[in-house]
Amino acid sequence: MNEVIVMAMQQRDKLIEEIRRIKGWGMSLTLSFAKSAKFFGGYVMDVEAVGKDILDCAYAIHSRFGSGLLEKAYRVILATELKRLGHLVEEEKVCGFSYNGQEYQNMFRVDLLVDDSIVVELKSVSRREPVFAKQCLTYLRLLDKHLGFVINFGMPSLKDGIERIANNI
């Protein structure tokens, strides 16, 4: 078993060096191992880089389609674009939590969970509501995640519809 772990770590290190060499990123590239990941050889870039990909895709989608589609359409398109970039994307992930030793299953759905690290809540309504950010922060806390976004595609200007939510665990 230990030999398998050592081999996996050696392969990880080789992959990191190869990516740095190809991209010219040097030591500034931050990679972390993600056990459950089935993408990019088991590696995922740091959450800020993933967050940038999410926002870049959201802006491209909003530029192309505007604010007239249903939330489901934006979710499917955004998930498809992020997968195309090599991210692990779980759509409408059913989640639960524990409280006082009791497990509560199937209590809420996260619109998108990207690379098992970023919660994305999507909306397609004409105004921003404070409850959207509260909902996202609650999901971050229950899932023990650090970063989330509320993206409201219903706003005429997408920059007015994006909220970055940080959970200071």
Positions of PLM-derived features:
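A short acidic/basic microdomain associated with nuclease active sites
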Residues: 83-100
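Short connector loops at helix/strand junctions that flank enzyme active sites
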Residues: 77, 84, 92, 105-109, ...
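Solvent-exposed, charged helical/coil patches
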Residues: 26-88, 137, 164-169
